[in-house]
Amino acid sequence: AGFSPTDSLRIAIAMTAAKGKNAFAEKTLKNAGGYSGVISAAYSLILLDCAAYPNELCSRSAVIEKLLSYEIKSGGFAFSGSRGDPDVSAMVLTALSPYKNDSDVSPCFERTLSFLSSVQNGSGGFSSFGTENCESSSQVLIALSSSGIDAARDVRFLKNGRSVCDAIMSYRRSDGGFAHISDGNSDNTATVQALLALLS
């Protein structure tokens, strides 16, 4: 069995980061126009910008238009349903960050920032599917850093004096790893995402 569209895009992003433009990424981008879903659209845009792939492979404007069409009326973006999800909204912001000042992107970009600020928990962290977790907070920090926002000082993202950086560090365990949830043990996915976020 082949890779899913989202997995193909993830692999292509990793390969581009490691070795620059490559045939696998170019093939993936050629197919990207047929992919559906907010995450595929976000990853397509990130991949396009990883190594300045040409528009001939996949139109940036078309991907941006598709991505913007997934915005939920009540705010943010989600895999499904009518309520925004911090994880997905953050991934979209990361993808759109190079275009945040474009007239067709800026209004949605600012609304999504406002949405994330409004759903930030008192701990400084973020929840997905009702559970506060390290990975959601990490995705938001990556999005804010990509957008040039100082998550430790911007008042929109300080709750009870705590930032998303504070929330992420609360998941750190004595073995150096990071847990998925507050009372959990170190988790590989949480650790990778936390380190990526803190380095962003």
Where are each of the predicted segments found?
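Core helices of alpha-solenoid repeat scaffolds
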Residues: 25-29, 60-64, 109, 113, ...
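An alpha-helical repeat/solenoid feature that recognizes helix-turn-helix modules
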Residues: 2-21, 34-60, 72-111, 122-157, ...
